[in-house]
Amino acid sequence: LRQTFGKRVSPCHTSMKINKHCFPNGLRLVHYEDTSTQMVALNIVYDVGARDEHPEHTGFAHLFEHLMFGGSAHIPDYDTPLQLAGGENNAWTNNDITNYYLTVPKTNVETAFWLESDRMLELTFSEQGLEVQRGVVMEEFKQRCLNQPYGDIGHLFRPLAFRVHPYRWPTIGKELSHIEQATLDEVKSFFYRFYAPNNAVLAVTGNISWEETVRLTEKWFGPVPRRNVPVRRLPQEPEQTEERRLTVERNVPLDALLMGYHMCDRGNADYYTFDILSDILSNGRSSRCLLYTSPSPR
């Protein structure tokens, strides 16, 4: 692979002009102007994920992703104003971050700043809202992890790879009961600890100037106060010194083999080499592992 792609991955050189600014409340802004489109995209990344959960209260980061669409301080329904503005949105959570993004026509871009800043300021917390979203997430847990073949692979594999680090449980949570037992007070505490301008990065790209982006960010996000975000103290995962193996027998259509190796972090220059290598070996019908194990040539 190194002979094919070079001894080391070189950084990508681009003529894209990226603007950056940090506001007094700690919000970091990243901007790129693209006049070839009539749309503008806003993306907010909060520095919180499943790794920040208590081992006995897992699944909270993902649950909270759902709660963020349940209404905020001055906007009882998030989706309706966005749809009226011609926009669309989505979100996802992983072990490290929670990501929210939306796109709107450039003529309605201020609606996007208004919506995102208001739910960063404060959500509408209610027992009814929690019950609804808790039910949605529990059904997702059942559908993905309990009711289909191989659905619990993440729950089986992660504890093999990580013994003490919170990467040892999947984003959706270790157990269904953790989500079922989530209380409103716990949800509020999670919000005020992690959902803060000084724990977020706002990226804006599309047909909007840097000056207008700064103005709208200052107008809508500037009044959102800083919060006391806890210092992250994660346990250090000890080095793996021997092979770890687990065999599970199930009534499933086909056998499955899952293998994993510890590798460098994303900031390492070799990360992209390993990422490409993983795709070549095992991603898709043309991957090497599939071709070499197939009973007939393809």
Task: Please report, for each region that a protein language model flagged, where it lies by residue.
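N- or domain-start disorder-to-order transition segments that initiate the globular core
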Residues: 15-37
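Short, low-complexity Ser/Thr-rich regulatory SLiMs
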Residues: 33-35, 93, 250
